[in-house]
């Protein structure tokens, strides 16, 4: 089988910490090149990772079968549109675009072009979350908290909902089966319109779902708790599993070989996209799944603005 030619757009902090270590460990693909509009900053990064620097987005597209996009959210629509129109498959950081209409237009464009367009919701590929999903058939309650130590501002409410709270909503809805309805919730902002706190309630049949985030909680902790028929399961920071059944408590150790990037789902996410392109299969977070959580976050924001 011909090796897939992979490219990267955007070389900021997330790309360097989470994606380049995975993509540079190429096995059944080749890392062809990278492009960023800030050439002066991009060149040293490309040199340290031994990745060729492309002179333009179009030249990168011409040399690649698929591209990972890690540029700013504001650039997503233009960058992804250009790549899709050039016949290139795309995996892009969430959110798909900075507004819902543009996100839906990108999904429609990918469908017309018969190309793979996937949103990189890495938590869907975190091994412990994947294991939890298989044990929720009898769940009565599912709660996900993702807090920040001190991250109020400088962006407005809409930006923070789309940039960070989106992860919580997408993960919780995916764990529940993705067919939940929004029942209500609370949003608190400061006088500058910056998000302080969010908590929302959903239902999926008998299952009750809660999502929660505080921007100045003094902690970066992320937890998921499931209450099922016969068990209480807690997952902390995607690496600690605590399960109670009757009188017994079970702590599942993380495999020694498992890297932090694998625990957090980045490895699984990248490989899933590449395998879908190679095998011409549909990714988990393509089509409707690519915009499901964004559509709900957009409604949460619109409801808050109308109050």
Curated annotation (Swiss-Prot):
<dbReference type="InterPro" id="IPR051317">
    <property type="entry name" value="Gfo/Idh/MocA_oxidoreduct"/>
</dbReference>
<protein>
    <recommendedName>
        <fullName>Putative oxidoreductase YceM</fullName>
        <ecNumber>1.-.-.-</ecNumber>
    </recommendedName>
</protein>
<comment type="similarity">
    <text>Belongs to the Gfo/Idh/MocA family.</text>
</comment>
<dbReference type="Pfam" id="PF21378">
    <property type="entry name" value="YceM-like_C"/>
</dbReference>
<keyword id="KW-0560">Oxidoreductase</keyword>
<dbReference type="InterPro" id="IPR000683">
    <property type="entry name" value="Gfo/Idh/MocA-like_OxRdtase_N"/>
</dbReference>
<dbReference type="GO" id="GO:0000166">
    <property type="term" value="F:nucleotide binding"/>
</dbReference>
<dbReference type="InterPro" id="IPR036291">
    <property type="entry name" value="NAD(P)-bd_dom_sf"/>
</dbReference>
<dbReference type="GO" id="GO:0016491">
    <property type="term" value="F:oxidoreductase activity"/>
</dbReference>
<dbReference type="InterPro" id="IPR048477">
    <property type="entry name" value="YceM-like_C"/>
</dbReference>
<dbReference type="Pfam" id="PF01408">
    <property type="entry name" value="GFO_IDH_MocA"/>
</dbReference>
């Amino acid at each position: 089988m011909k090796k897939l030619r992979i490219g990267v757009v955007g070389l900021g902090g997330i790309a360097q910490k989470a994606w380049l270590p995975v993509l540079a460990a190429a096995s059944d693909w080749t890392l062809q090149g990278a492009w960023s509009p800030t050439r002066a900053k991009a060149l040293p990064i490309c040199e340290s990772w031994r990745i060729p620097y492309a002179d333009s987005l179009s030249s990168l597209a011409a040399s690649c079968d698929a591209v990972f996009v890690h540029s700013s959210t504001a650039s997503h629509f233009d960058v992804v549109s250009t790549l899709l129109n050039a016949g290139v498959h795309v995996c892009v950081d969430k959110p798909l675009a900075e507004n819902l209409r543009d996100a839906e237009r990108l999904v429609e464009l990918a469908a017309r072009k018969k190309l793979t367009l996937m949103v990189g919701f890495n938590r869907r590929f975190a091994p412990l979350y994947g294991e939890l999903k298989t044990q929720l058939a009898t769940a009565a309650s599912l709660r996900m908290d993702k807090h920040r130590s001190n991250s109020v501002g400088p962006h407005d409410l809409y930006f923070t909902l789309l940039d960070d709270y989106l992860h919580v909503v997408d993960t919780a809805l995916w764990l529940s089966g993705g067919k939940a309805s929004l029942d209500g919730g609370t949003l608190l902002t400061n006088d500058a319109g910056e998000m302080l706190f969010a908590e929302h309630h959903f239902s999926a049949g008998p299952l009750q779902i809660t999502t929660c985030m505080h921007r100045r909680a003094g902690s970066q902790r992320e937890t998921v708790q499931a209450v099922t028929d016969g068990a209480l399961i807690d997952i902390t920071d995607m690496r600690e599993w605590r399960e109670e059944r009757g009188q017994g408590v079970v702590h599942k150790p993380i495999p020694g070989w498992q890297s932090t990037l694998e625990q957090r789902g980045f490895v699984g996410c990248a490989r899933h996209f590449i395998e879908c392109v190679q095998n011409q299969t549909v990714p988990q977070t393509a089509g409707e799944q690519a915009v499901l959580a964004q559509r709900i976050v957009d409604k949460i924001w619109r409801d808050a603005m109308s109050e």
